[in-house]
């Protein structure tokens, strides 16, 4: 039986691997990817999710931007990591990825409502779920 999941993450190299595994696992059906700021900025984590999806050619997964910052404290920035993506920001095929127009909170809500029994897998900060 296939398990429907949403991956809420802050993609660097580790979460990029998680996206690849979730897309390729025969028992998983990745319904959405929601991103947010973690050790990298929210723009960078979103870009990394798009790069990963473009690399594996699975362009039908909704991807959205989420929280820019933590709710309570200032974001701790890993400046050495934020200077560069760690992935390939110069990819020519990123234009084929259309970001979901909803923010991550709305995408989470809509996907959960439309997929009873879905599991939210979190690998980053939990701000989008707060």
What are these model-derived regions, one by one?
Residues 1-130:
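N-terminal acidic, glycine/proline-rich low-complexity segments
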């Amino acid at each position: 039986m296939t398990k429907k999941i949403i991956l809420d993450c802050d993609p660097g190299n580790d979460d990029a691997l998680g996206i690849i595994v979730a897309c390729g696992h025969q028992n998983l059906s990745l319904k959405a990817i929601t991103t947010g700021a973690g050790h990298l900025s929210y723009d960078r984590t979103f870009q990394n999710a798009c790069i990963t999806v473009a690399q594996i050619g699975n362009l039908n997964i909704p991807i959205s931007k989420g929280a820019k910052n933590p709710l309570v404290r200032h974001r701790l920035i890993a400046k050495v990591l934020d200077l560069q993506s760690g992935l390939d920001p110069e990819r020519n095929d990123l234009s084929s990825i259309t970001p979901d127009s909803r923010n991550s909170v709305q995408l989470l809500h809509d996907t959960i409502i439309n997929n009873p029994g879905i599991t939210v897998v979190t690998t980053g900060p939990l701000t989008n779920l707060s």
